[in-house]
Amino acid sequence: GQMSAWYVLSSLGMYEAEPAGGRYWFGSPLFDRAEVTVPGGVFTITAENNSAANKYIQRVWLNGQPYTKPWIGHADLMKGGELIFEMGPEEKVWYCPDEPEAYADQRPAEEQRLFKSEAVEGEIARVCGLLTNERLRWMFANCFPNTLDTTVHYGEDEAGNPDTYVYTGDIPAMWLRDSGAQVWPYVQLCKEDPALQKMIAGVIRRQLKLINIDPYANAFNVAPTGAHNKTDFPQADPMVFERKWEIDSHCYPLRLAHHYWKTTGDTSVFGAEWVEAMHNIVKTLKEQQMKEDPGDYTFLRTTDRQLDTRCHVGRGNPVKPVGLIVSAFRPSDDATTFGFLVPSNFMAVTSLRKAAEILTAVNGERELAAECTALADEVAGALQQYAVVEHPEFGKIYAFEVDGFGSAQLMDDANVPSLLAMPYLGDVER
């Protein structure tokens, strides 16, 4: 019954994208006219000029009035009435996004904000002064400081060094990827705010410590609390919140550290912990090239979500050792289908080159820097040889995942790194 109703409504140009959400989102209808009997009478859907050529919505009317929402509510549908689609040959943004009732400040009260930065507040005022769109101004003023307001926990370690733990939002755990991305927009303001610079230095220091605890983990607890999924096998260190191996868990700390160094000139974060972390990163990335054997890393979880665990007793699908690096999971924390995750391998190349620059200029670690460069060169060459596939319509494109045997996954994932985000990250030219 429910599926039948879904098919009927979708054929009329109304899609229930959110199960039980009470909204039907508009798409191209299949018919010129249809009538549906509802509790309030009859609901008529008319698609003027509908045809294979005129398949895009141009305007919508509901009960004789212009309608600017991209959806209709269940209650309105049940009342009965008439919905008219005017169709045309070209895509058109005909609707208006939902507007809030008032552009109210959504930030926590000042005394409840976790970290305060005068430079960030100044940047909010500067940018909002440039924006003429009230909605964009409201969004920026609330979103830009959100990481500082709600997720940053700044302190000092036993030696008095900055130590910053960053929640990933609604989960009280620190993802290496997320924390590197969350504080990234603030690095540009470090020179204006010494406290902000110390906070970000604390993020880098904490990331390096966490990598040295377990270079295969993607998320960590603030202390050895043992908080994690109790069905995971093998069980992880009490500091580890989740042990999903993702290449970008190494790349984001390197990207952040390099950007911080280039912006501030501060080298205090590149001490013994940094060098140890770089040894662990290179060792792990080489292990996951799987040139000699699959290695020791496995991940299993009791779950009803197929992509929340790995197949083949936690080892994932086999790969051919061609120089690329296996990522057991994607940035979405979903398991990879084919282990060589292409966007993450691209990010590994640029991140290793950035690390080599620091190791040479700051630490004088030329041998370790050379290892980073050699690994980056190898992966870069393998990407051009194995990550490029021939698409029947678009020609040569990058696959999302490959296995080295010839299999390829042609898709993209919403989180970053992704194929779409590679230019944003600087991993490929635009």
Language-model-detected regions and their locations in the chain:
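C-terminal capping/lid segments that line or modulate ligand- or cofactor-binding pockets
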Residues: G1-L30, P89, T231-P238, R243-E246, ...
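Non-catalytic C-terminal accessory modules of carbohydrate-active enzymes
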Residues: G1-P108
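Generic, well-ordered alpha-helical scaffold segments in large soluble proteins
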Residues: Y7-Y15, C143, R206, L210, ...
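Well-ordered alpha-helical scaffold segments within catalytic/enzyme domains
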Residues: L9-M14, A119-T132, A181-P194, Y252-T267, ...
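Low-complexity, Ser/Thr/Pro/Gly-enriched N-terminal "stalk/linker" regions
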Residues: P108-R177
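Active-site-adjacent bridging/hinge elements
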Residues: P145-P162, T225-F233, P318-R330
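Aromatic-rich carbohydrate-recognition surfaces in CAZymes
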Residues: P172-I200, I204-L307
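Extended ligand-binding clefts on enzyme/binding-domain cores
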Residues: L176, P215-Y216, A223, D232, ...
